[in-house]
Amino acid sequence: MITIEQLLDILKKDHNFREVLDADGYHYHYQGLSFERLSYDSRQVDGKTLFFAKGATFKADYLKEAITNGLQLYISEVDYELGIPVVLVTDIKKAMSLIAMAFYGNPQEKLKLLAFTGTKGKTTAAYFAYHMLKESYKPAMFSTMNTTLDGKTFFKSQLTTPESLDLFAMMAECVTNGMTHLIMEVSSQAYLVDRVYGLTFDVGVFLNISPDHIGPIEHPTFEDYFYHKRLLMENSRAVVINSGMDHFSFLADQVADQEHVFYGPLSDNQITTSQAFSFEAKGQLAGHYDIQLIGHFNQENAMAAGLACLRLGASLADIQKGIAKTRVPGRMEVLTMTNHAKVFVDYAHNGDSLEKLLSVVEEHQTGKLMLILGAPGNKGESRRADFGRVIHQHPNLTVILTADDPNFEDPEDISKEIASHIARPVEIISDREQAIQKAMSLCQGAKDAVIIAGKGADAYQIVKGQQVAYAGDLAIAKHYL
C-alpha cells in the first residue's frame, strides 16, 4: 500500500511534482487516499488503484473507462478534466519508476543486481552469469529470452527490460521467493523511456557497441543510442567493459573514477588460447574453461560474465562449472541432417551479430552455405542496409530472404529493401517454413550448412501488432532433418 502523502513526497524529492488539481483548484498537499494496486492499463483498475496515464497514444476515453470502474485519482503529465483529482508531474515515466520502487518495498535493496548492456550478446552473457551464480547462490533472471523469478520456472519475456511497474513487482516476487541475486539485460530503450530510473546496479557490464535500433520510433542517431547505452555505467557501483569494443577509450575515461575491470585485447584479462569447445584465460579468471557455445565472441561473453560474477561472490570453480553448463535457447543451436549437413539456428538480428555468426560457421563448414534471413517491420530500419552489406561481403553464401516479424509492413517489401543492398541475385520466399525447407533440401553433405538467422527460439511471428503462432525455426528444422 502507498498513501497519497507518501507518493507526493517521492515526487517532490525528485523535483517531479507540479500540483494536485481537483474541483477545488490547486493543491500542494493532499490527504485521505491510499492505494493497494498500481496500473498503467485502464482495463485493470478499481477504487484502490493508482493509475498512471502514460504514452503518446493515451486517450481520454481510456481514463473514462477507468473512472467507471471506480478510479479515484490518476497521475499524468496532462489534466484530462474528467472530474476526479489528478497529480500532475513533469515526467510520468520517472514517476512510475520511483513510486513502484517504494510501493513494492524497495526490493532492489534486498538483491545483488547485475546488468548487461551491449548491441549483441546480452542474453548469452546473462545465461552464463545465471549458471555461474546458481552454483552457490539463488539467482533470478530477466532476459530477452526467458524470465525466472524463482530459479525453477521460466516464462517468455515481453520486453528486454520490463516496464517499471512490472519490473519492481517482479523484483519483489524474487525477494519473496528467497532469491539472492538478479541478472538483467538493460536495453538502451530502458534508459530512453526511464524504465530503470532511480535504480543502481551492483555491477554493470558493457559488452560491445555497433549501430542498431536506429529509426523513427527508436534512437534518431548512433550518438543517441550510444549515450543511452552508457547510462548503465553511470548507474552502476562497479563496471566491467570490453577493451576491444568501439569507443573503448571514451568509456575508459568515463569510468576512471569508478570501480572497474576491463577484459579483452587491451587488458590483463584475456583469452590466451581458443578452441571450438574450450579456451584458456589469463588475469583474474586464469584457467581452463570448457564451453558448449562455439565462437570466440561467446568465449568473450563468458569472460565478461565471469568477471562480473567474481565481484558478486562467485568462485573460480563456480565460474568454470557455470560456463560448461550454459546453453541458450536459439543461440548457436546446431542440428545435423541425415546427410550430415549442419543446420545453425541463431538469434543474430543485426549486422554485427550476423557477421559474427557467419564467420563462425565459415570456419567450420567449407561447402555450400545457405542463409535464411529477414528483418522486422516498423523498427530498426537501419538493419536492412546492414544485412545487405554483410551478405555482400560473403560471396559464398546462397541467400533466401524471408519474413521475420513483419508487423504492419509487407515482408516481401522488407526483403526487397535488404536485396537492394546486395550486388548479386538472392531469392525471396516470404513463407519462412518454405524458405527453411528449400534451403535444407539443397544441402547434400557434411561440409554444407543452413544458417537460419533472426528469430532464434521465438515461436511466433509479429503480424499487424499481434503475435501469430509459428512453430519456430528449431522445430521446423528438426522436422526436415
From Swiss-Prot:
Binding site for ATP: 118-124
Sequence motif: L-lysine recognition motif, positions: 404-407
HAMAP family: MurE
Record's protein name: UDP-N-acetylmuramoyl-L-alanyl-D-glutamate--L-lysine ligase
Catalytic EC class: ligase
Main location: cytoplasm
Family stated for the protein in its record: Belongs to the MurCDEF family. MurE subfamily.
Domain of life: Bacteria
GO molecular function annotations of the record: ATP binding; magnesium ion binding; UDP-N-acetylmuramoyl-L-alanyl-D-glutamate-L-lysine ligase activity
Pathway: Cell wall biogenesis; peptidoglycan biosynthesis
GO biological process, one term: regulation of cell shape
Record localization: Cytoplasm
SUPFAM superfamilies (UniProt xref): MurD-like peptide ligases, catalytic domain, MurD-like peptide ligases, peptide-binding domain, MurE/MurF N-terminal domain
Source organism of the structure: Streptococcus pyogenes serotype M2 (strain MGAS10270)
Gene3D superfamilies, A to Z: Mur ligase, C-terminal domain, Mur-like, catalytic domain, MurE/MurF, N-terminal domain
Record PTM N6-carboxylysine, positions in chain: 229
KW Nucleotide-binding (keyword) present: yes
InterPro entries the UniProt entry points to: Mur-like_cat_sf, Mur_ligase_C, Mur_ligase_C_dom_sf, Mur_ligase_cen, MurE/MurF_N, UDP-N-AcMur-Glu-dNH2Pim_ligase
Gene it is expressed from: murE
Entry GO CC: cytoplasm
Keywords: ATP-binding, Cell cycle, Cell division, Cell shape, Cell wall biogenesis/degradation, Cytoplasm, Ligase, Nucleotide-binding, Peptidoglycan synthesis
UniProt keyword annotation of Transmembrane helix present: no
PANTHER family attached to this UniProt entry: MUR LIGASE FAMILY MEMBER, UDP-N-ACETYLMURAMOYL-L-ALANYL-D-GLUTAMATE--2,6-DIAMINOPIMELATE LIGASE MURE HOMOLOG, CHLOROPLASTIC
